[in-house]
Amino acid sequence: MEKGARHRHNTDKNHAGGSESEDFPEASSGGGGVALKKEIGLVSACGIIVGNIIGSGIFVSPKGVLENAGSVGLAVIVWIVTGLITAVGALCYAELGVTIPKSGGDYSYVKDIFGGLAGFLRLWIAVLVIYPTNQAVIALTFSNYVLQPLFPTCFPPDSGLRLLAAICLLLLTWVNCSSVRWATRVQDIFTAGKLLALALIIIMGVVQICKGEYFWLEPKNAFDNFQEPDIGLIALAFLQGSFAYGGWNFLNYVTEELVDPYKNLPRAIFISIPLVTFVYVFANVAYITAMSPQELLASNAVAVTFGEKLLGVMAWIMPISVALSTFGGVNGSLFTSSRLFFAGAREGHLPSVLAMIHVKRCTPIPALLFTCLSTLLMLVTSDMYTLINYVGFINYLFYGVTVAGQIVLRWKKPDIPRPIKINLLFPIIYLLFWAFLLIFSLWSEPVVCGIGLAIMLTGVPVYFLGVYWQHKPKCFNDFIELLTLVSQKMCVVVYPEVDGGSGTEGTREDMEEQQQPICQPSPGKDKDSLEQSQP
């Protein structure tokens, strides 16, 4: 571990650029060095997007939109419109993904465009709450649908649910640590499984329509309100619809592991988002052919109720489909979130050991173990659902900040290479819709949003003490270096090399925070470079 294995914490050089790609450029599969391998093709890329968007919600409780829309027709319109807005946001992320081709997604874009503090706050809220709680909830949903048939007359024991959820997390963490190819194969298989289950639901809906069972789809009935119309509730329906499409940006977290990202990133987005929109709209239409709006709203597991009504002895397919869907969802979330933490550590925003990969498997084992451990900790707390409510607003806030960064980058750096360059009307449309939902969220739940902001702002002192403050006591640096070395030996990991060439070229010598955002002018650098440096 002599070459590039150890990190020098006590340095005199103070960087001030938007990124560190000169020290840590895109990982490559070429050469013989240790580097992240480009093993994610177009099919696997689509599997990551579709698998992360489609979790258990469309099977279990797609009723949030209908409940707030007030009519079947308006609910279908909400699903279509939110799908279109999601596609617009994905187009914006596609341009950013090929303009700043780094893993880390919106964290990397916000950091490079607006500076280190903004990027750190995005990372902080993701590390602290968003990913651990979401993964814990998905794993608990998986265990609930696996154990429920064993307890037909009562609820499964809570300890059993949490134990099976922990086993699920540990198993998938092992798969992800072992091989990127294994992880993507698991994602492909389980994404295909959930799409087949949804295709069955849609086909059954078509059969119902052919039988004349479309009372609630007739125009006069579709827009028959079962509650008083309210603009606030309609806005809430759009907010629920937007949350249902969450995960559309996850492929941007693994850009460096994509085969030919300049082509496959936008292609995967263009294929996946319309596919998910189609599935969401027609699955909800299918549900309405078998259930009245009141029955749908009263059901705790819509797909299971649908199966009981139409599939007869084959109704067991639906709970199994939910379990398979959530299992794949946990895998996709582990895969992408670990790359976010890897990217954060590479920029000096998290402990440096998280930026290392296994010397043979080329997987970010420390980042995966960190992700798994934080999720296991969430499994033993009873407040994770409350935390999700608090930070959901913050997560949505950063979507808009990232898209706004696209406009800022167009203005400040108009000449940098952009393999994809969309019309600025698209980010403007997305930001208008985003602002509408954001303002409504603040108006309807000011306390929840305020607590979410407070949780995010706890990252400010952490940033200045842990990242911005460079000249820490030598005893502290020595202790951290010792922990890093021990972790390296336990996990058999090193920093990735530049091109798999000489070890000296890939050595990660400095991981200090960079203060100057990408959009700040720097006349000494070439206009096509995204990095800014200050001696």
Swiss-Prot record:
Keyword Phosphoprotein belongs to the record: yes
InterPro entries: AA/rel_permease1, AminoAcid_Transporter, L_AA_transporter
Keywords of this entry: Amino-acid transport, Antiport, Cell membrane, Disulfide bond, Membrane, Phosphoprotein, Transmembrane, Transmembrane helix, Transport
GO biological process, one term: L-leucine import across plasma membrane
Biased composition (Basic residues): 1-10
Binding site for L-leucine: 53, 246
One Pfam family this sequence matches: AA_permease_2
Catalysis performed (reactions): L-histidine(in) + L-phenylalanine(out) = L-histidine(out) + L-phenylalanine(in); L-tryptophan(in) + L-phenylalanine(out) = L-tryptophan(out) + L-phenylalanine(in); L-isoleucine(in) + L-phenylalanine(out) = L-isoleucine(out) + L-phenylalanine(in); L-valine(in) + L-phenylalanine(out) = L-valine(out) + L-phenylalanine(in)
Topological domains annotated Cytoplasmic: 1-44, 96-116, 179-181, 253-265, 339-364, 409-423, 467-535
CC per GO annotation: apical plasma membrane; basolateral plasma membrane; membrane; microvillus membrane
Entry's pH dependence statement: Optimum pH is 6.5.
Residue stretches of biased makeup (Basic and acidic residues): 524-535
Control of this protein's activity: The transporter activity is inhibited by 2-aminobicyclo-(2,2,1)heptane-2-carboxylic acid (BCH) (a specific inhibitor of system L transport).
Keyword Lipid biosynthesis: no
Extracellular side: 66-73, 150-157, 211-230, 288-312, 383-386
Major location category of this protein: membrane
Site features described as Important for substrate specificity, chain residue numbers: 134, 246
Record's function text: Associates with SLC3A2 to form a functional heterodimeric complex that translocates small and large neutral amino acids with broad specificity and a stoichiometry of 1:1. Functions as amino acid antiporter mediating the influx of extracellular essential amino acids mainly in exchange with the efflux of highly concentrated intracellular amino acids. Has relatively symmetrical selectivities but strongly asymmetrical substrate affinities at both the intracellular and extracellular sides of the transporter.
Family designation: Belongs to the amino acid-polyamine-organocation (APC) superfamily. L-type amino acid transporter (LAT) (TC 2.A.3.8) family.
Name listed for the protein in its UniProt record: Large neutral amino acids transporter small subunit 2
Organism name: Oryctolagus cuniculus (Rabbit)
